[in-house]
């Protein structure tokens, strides 16, 4: 996953 990416937001 790219930096700053969050599936939970």
UniProtKB/Swiss-Prot annotation:
The keyword Secreted applies. GO terms for cellular component: extracellular region. GO terms for molecular function: toxin activity. Expressed by the skin glands. Keywords: Amphibian defense peptide, G-protein coupled receptor impairing toxin, Secreted, Toxin, Vasoactive, Vasodilator. It is found in: Secreted. It comes from the Eukaryota. GO terms for biological process: defense response; vasodilation. Produces in vitro relaxation of rat arterial smooth muscle and constriction of intestinal smooth muscle. May target bradykinin receptors (BDKRB). Belongs to the bradykinin-related peptide family. This is [Ala1,Thr6]-bradykinin. It comes from Physalaemus signifer.
């Amino acid at each position: 996953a790219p930096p700053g990416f969050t599936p939970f937001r």
